[in-house]
Each structure stands twice: as C-alpha cells, then as structure tokens.
Amino acid sequence: MKTSVQDFRKLVAQVGEIDQIMIDVEKAEGIYVWDTDKKRYMDMLSGICVGNVGHRNPKVVQAVKEQMDKYMHVMVYGEFVQSPQYRYIQRLKEFLPESLSQIFYVNSGSEAIEGALKAAKLFTKRSEIISCKASYHGSTLGAVSMLSQEEFTRGFRPLLPDCNKIGYNSFEDLEKITERTACVVAEAVAVGEGVKLPIEGWLQALRKRCNETGTVLIFDEIQTGFGRTGKLFAFEHFDGVVPDILCIAKGMGGGMPIGAFVGRDDIMQSLNNHHPLIGHASTFGGHPLGCVAALATLNCIIEDKLMADVERKGTRYRNELTHPLIKQVKGIGLFNCIELREDVDWQKALISCFSEGIITGTHLFNSQCLSLKPALIITDEQITESIERIKTALDKI
C-alpha cells in the first residue's frame, strides 16, 4: 500500500522538506532500498551510518528471530540479569582498550551522550562542558546545549549553563580546558561540516590536556564506529589516544535501535553512587533484541573481516569520483563526503542523485557536502556502478 508524502506529513511530525527525495520504502537488502514503485536505489547513506553490515543482514535477522522466541522486554534496565546484555559487552571488550570496561545501555546516540555527560559531572563534581564548534551530538537538551549555531538553539533557551566551545584542531583553544571542566565531548573524526580529520598531534594534545586538568574525555563515535573508518573505532587510528568514555550507537545494532556509553570503572560507578539511585535510567535500554542484533553485527564485522578492505574501497571513491562540479571527495575508509563547488545548487544535486537511484544526504552544517557512506559489504562492482550513477546525476543538473 502506497502512502503519499502529503498524507504522511499530515500525521507524522517533522519530516523531510524535499518531496522528491521522500521515497516510499517497500523493502531493503544489502546496499539496496526499493520503493513501492519497485525502483531500486543504491544506499550511500546507510541510514546515516546505521547499516554498516547492510540492510537486513541475514545473521542479524536470525539472531533477532531466535531471541524473539525466548523473550523480549521483561524489566527496566539493570533490574534483572539478562544474558544478551552480558554477552555483548563480554565480546566487545575483546576489542576495546582495557580501561573501557563498563557499559551502560540506552536506545540511541543522543541518550548515550546524555548519560556520558551526567556520569562526567557526577564523577568530577564540576559543571563546565566543552565541545567542538560545528559539532552535533544529539537532540536532547544537553546535546543541543553543546551546539554553537544560534539558528539551532534559539528556540530551546534557556540551555544548560556552562557549555563552552573549542575549535576542532585548535591547539590554542586547548588552554580553555581547566580544572573546572567536567568533560570535553569530541569526535576523533569530525562530521558536522563534512568529514574532517584531526591534524597531526591534536588528539594527543587534547588527551594530554584532559589528563593535566582531571577532565573526562568523551569520544562520540556514534557515526564513525563499527568499522566505518577501517578500524572498529576511529580513535584507534591515532596513537596514544583513548577516551575515558566512548559513546556508540547507529552501526552498533545492524538496523535495530540500540546505543551505549562505555567507560572507566571509576567514572561509571559514579552513576551507582548517586542518591537517589537514578544516575541515569532507561526502560528499554539494553533491550534483548537490540543486544543480540548488536552481537551479531559485531561478529559479522570481525568474523567476515569486513574492515580489511574498507580503506581500499574508500580510496576508490576518493580517487575515481571526479567531476567538474566536485571540489573534492574526502574522508577515511568508507566515511566520506562529496564536497560540491560553492556555486552548485546542492538541492538540485541531491534530487538528481535520487532520480538516478542514489540515496545520499547533506552534512548538517555544510549542505555542499553530500554523504558517501555505503555499507562495508559493498562490492567493487557496486562501487563502480555508484560512481557512474553519481557522475550521471551531476551531469543532469
């Protein structure tokens, strides 16, 4: 049954503004999405880095089906022993630095950020939160308070007090981190304005400054995690840099909703020591279906060696996707963006891509950058086809 965009808008709040890219989804599999007119699209957005192992991955689907036959939700988070929660963190810890040893499950990346902020404040007994300019960490009031763009925050004031900003890659701004700073929230690879890599030594200097001031360093790996950059987590590319809290979601669940923050024992225990005993709470956090999906996703990434070819595949896009309207294709692994020339109408480019069967989207703070983040399972033949389709789309605007 088809649903018109107009009918959808009447009942579902805050939906997309460009009718031509609001496809009516029929099914999805691998890197493909089909609409109700049976048109097939190549997904270069992966649900914003959710579908790292592809849509409807058979191993993820089977794990969810098997768990559904046992039980689904039985109790709010943390009250019962649930093996899906334990088995997931037990497996994930095999690939994490030893210091990241305790997990708190939530439902989304925004909630992971919110929980991490609360843990950092409880642990340090400080109030200041520092984030990077032009960064986005979620839609809760705490996350919105970290935004630096007035147009995104003016309707939600008053925001949380004591939220300040530093420049990503600014060594000078690191001096703004002091003994009154509870935490710094940063991305190892920044995404808000288009994919941006840290300059040499900056992440190490950030880590050093946080150590000097007793500040909790929180890494947001909600988009970059789970093999997207060629490592399980982006921070692994940079020697000597380990966060105190790691926020994860999106690609974690292979298409199922789940998120978490993983941190040092002493920091995570501050949530338990809070009185009353609700340092953070979640009814559906650690949902068994989400946890088994996450475990199947992680096992798929590791056992099928999906990360081994990610950088080579990404390099193909960065080297082969050239066009007079493209300024550059930049990124790391399969975490890339197409930066259009300043005089190119990004809306026309976006609509033309969808017309040619390419799903993409713009970066939040830079509409001239189109996302290029297909599933890790994409084949060389599919890469070639997607490159040609994107070139054709740009030819037609």
What is the meaning of each model-derived region?
Residues 1-397:
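Conserved N-terminal phosphate-binding loop of PLP-dependent enzymes in the Aspartate aminotransferase
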